[in-house]
């Protein structure tokens, strides 16, 4: 196929540019899975003081009497997780220092300075580990998605895998925005990444495979850069839309439009050839030639669709496993690449 791209179809033309653009939009959206950085962000919080008439987590964060009830940190801000022990009862308007001793105790209830995060809606208070768990669950999902998307890509095609992934990205992202409790939010976080985080790999393949060897490295660099650009886009949106539910709706609702890729993108030619779908592969190749204003000869099409190279008997799974075990190079790669991947995930996501 590379030889045909170089000599006939063109290494880079309108077809390749269109694929990179469409796949690039999908890759940008794949960066939105890191939205938990904003949706589960820490917000200012302090102990709720029922002795002073406070009854809600949305009470005024810094009333005039607050330093009578809550100690200050070394930087002059209110302690987030401790308060002075109460000795009597006051009101929201009058709560003097005489109602509190100097001994400290941990908070049981909280008042929040902002209502833009999961921490406020689900009253997480000082349970920072719960907020961090959101990112951990997301990372687990990115691990679980690999065999799932791999199976779908091999069985049904790269385009189908991409369309399913972007649909799941949009659907479960919107559902997550309507989470009614912490349990639902965490489950949706796991389902969201497990069923939707295969976007990057599928889009990357569709963008790069029909680009000629001369431009393939550049295309790969562009796709990787677009993922980073997606994180910047997400940051800008989060800057303008801070309430976490609205932020998620703003990020994921437009992603439903990418379901149209089922009609806009062509299936992977290499996959079609590997599955002996020769007529479909021919149509894609002719479409490439038409958009690039080039031609492809019948001889080249016949060579690509010749079953000669596929006529060799296939090895069964057991033979393939034994072949890997007996090859020092393959065995070393099989053992080390998972470690590289896991290490990269820990380093990248912290």
Indicate where each model-derived feature is located.
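Central mid-sequence intracellular linker of multi-pass
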Residues: 44-101, 240-311
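Helix-breaking motifs and short loop linkers at transmembrane-helix boundaries and internal kinks
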Residues: 157, 178-183, 241-242
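Hydrophobic core of transmembrane alpha-helices in multi-pass small-molecule transporters
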Residues: 114-115, 120-125, 184-198, 254-256
């Amino acid at each position: 196929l590379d030889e045909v791209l170089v000599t006939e179809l063109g290494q880079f033309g309108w077809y390749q540019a269109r694929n990179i653009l469409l796949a690039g939009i999908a890759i940008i959206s794949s960066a939105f899975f890191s939205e938990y950085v904003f949706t589960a962000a820490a917000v200012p919080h302090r102990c709720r003081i029922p002795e002073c008439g406070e009854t809600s987590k949305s009470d005024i964060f810094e009333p005039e009497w607050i330093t009578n009830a809550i100690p200050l940190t070394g930087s002059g801000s209110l302690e987030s997780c401790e308060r002075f022990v109460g000795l009597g009862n006051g009101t929201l308007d009058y709560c003097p220092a005489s109602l509190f001793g100097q001994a400290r105790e941990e908070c049981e209830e909280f008042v929040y300075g902002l209502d833009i995060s999961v921490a406020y809606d689900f009253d997480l208070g000082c349970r920072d580990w719960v907020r961090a768990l959101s990112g951990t669950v997301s990372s687990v999902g990115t691990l679980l998605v690999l065999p799932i998307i791999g199976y779908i890509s091999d069985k049904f095609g790269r385009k189908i895998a991409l369309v399913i992934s972007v649909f799941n990205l949009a659907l479960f992202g919107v559902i997550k925005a309507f989470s009614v409790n912490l349990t639902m939010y965490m489950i949706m976080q796991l389902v969201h990444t497990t069923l939707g985080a295969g976007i990057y790999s599928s889009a990357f393949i569709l963008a790069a495979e029909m680009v000629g060897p001369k431009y393939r490295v550049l295309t790969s660099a562009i796709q990787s850069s677009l993922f980073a650009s997606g994180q910047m886009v997400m940051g800008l949106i989060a800057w303008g839309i801070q309430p976490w539910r609205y932020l998620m709706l703003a990020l994921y609702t437009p992603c439903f439009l990418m379901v149209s890729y089922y009609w806009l993108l062509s299936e992977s030619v290499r996959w079609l050839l590997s599955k002996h779908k020769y007529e479909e592969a021919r149509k894609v190749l002719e479409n490439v030639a038409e958009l690039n204003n080039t031609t492809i000869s019948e001889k080249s099409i016949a060579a690509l669709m010749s079953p000669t190279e596929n006529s060799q008997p296939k090895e069964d799974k057991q033979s393939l496993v034994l072949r890997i075990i007996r090859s020092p190079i393959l065995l070393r790669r099989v053992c080390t690449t998972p470690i590289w991947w896991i290490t990269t995930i820990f380093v990248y996501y912290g």
